[in-house]
């Protein structure tokens, strides 16, 4: 049995060709802690971070999102896209369900440059207009160079 120590790379089975590292991410900790996973293959690395409270709590040393991803050598990132904006949840207190909105994330990211990692938005709430590929919101996100996770996609690391 292998023991997994958070923040240290873990190889699920010897010679499998990749490691997994858990990194703590601020998100409602009432029942347990929350971690993102970095999966490093032989050529590329992927960050899986479907849940977080806010970018201001997640980002360290005042880095912006892209600097933060580069500091961890991330090539592909799956990030929290729960809500497009707060109008989706006007009937609830946003403080009860903290997530950065896609609008906030896009304002921090700007348009994708050639050197930026791939970013895919995941963990979409059923109210999120990104679920409709033909929505204006989906078109805006894609026109900026970012992506929406699609079930069945394959990523080579």
Which stretches of residues belong to each language-model region?
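Cap/insert and terminal regions of metallo-dependent hydrolase folds
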Residues: 45, 53-153
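A generic structural motif
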Residues: 1-2, 144
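Core dinuclear metal-dependent hydrolase active-site scaffold
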Residues: 2-68, 152-157
